[in-house]
Amino acid sequence: MQNRNGNMRAVSLLSGGLDSSTLLSLVVSRGYEVVALSFDYGQRHSRELDSARKIAEYYKVEHKIMKIDLRPIGGSALTENISVPDVDLENIGKDIPVTYVPARNTILLSIALGLAEVTDSSKIFIGANALDYSGYPDCRPEYFDSINETFSLATKKTVEGGHIEVEAPLLKYSKADIVRLAVKLETPLGLTWSCYKGGKKACGVCDSCKLRLKGFMEAGSEDPIEYETVPAFYKKYLNTRE
């Protein structure tokens, strides 16, 4: 949607991971003037934020990093010293994981709403996808319907007839679908980071690494980043490509 001066403006949440980076590629390809918004919320490591900076620089978009500390709230392996268990691939997504951060999307989207109003943006883009809403309550389609209704009542711009809408274009996409889209859009996948752990290489054993590699395998592509440990299923896949 165009704003008053004819330019399409949007805020796109950017963590530096596969999903949000592919999303930024998509939003840029649609012709939006984008402000990429990242959050330093007290997560265990800054590796993903480093990737977010590189992705934003690659696309030459304005990039804001908001510092908010969610650690006092607790309740998540991403902000507390709670171990992230190794879960079998087939069991990932069956329960709400320990990496769920209480009310994170509501908090982050509320900040994005303020930025969208100030920048006269009509859209807030978030990279939630099909796998997310199987495990995270704030990534479900009904959640986004509800938050859009709330946001329509929450700002001066919207109550005066303006429009700000949260959109999750990848909501029905699997990881493999996202990888295919990223390849099509020439997203710089080698700059992205999905691992729950910091370090020079992704661990290859956390849920996020396994799901990422499974997505590349099912998409028929090879992940360009390096891993400390390569899961057996992905090794087998790589052997079939040689």
Can you say where each PLM-predicted feature lies in the sequence?
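ATP-dependent adenylation/nucleotidyltransferase module used to activate substrates
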Residues: 2-185
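Serine/threonine-rich low-complexity intrinsically disordered regions
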Residues: 69, 88, 206, 226-231
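Compositionally biased, intrinsically disordered low-complexity regions
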Residues: 76-77, 206, 222
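Local cysteine-cluster metal-coordination motifs and their immediate loop/turn environment
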Residues: 110, 193-214
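Charge-dense, low-complexity polyampholytic segments
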Residues: 124, 196-203, 221-229
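Short, charged low-complexity linear segments at domain edges
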Residues: 170-197, 234-241
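Short Fe-S-cluster ligation motifs
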Residues: 210-212, 216-242
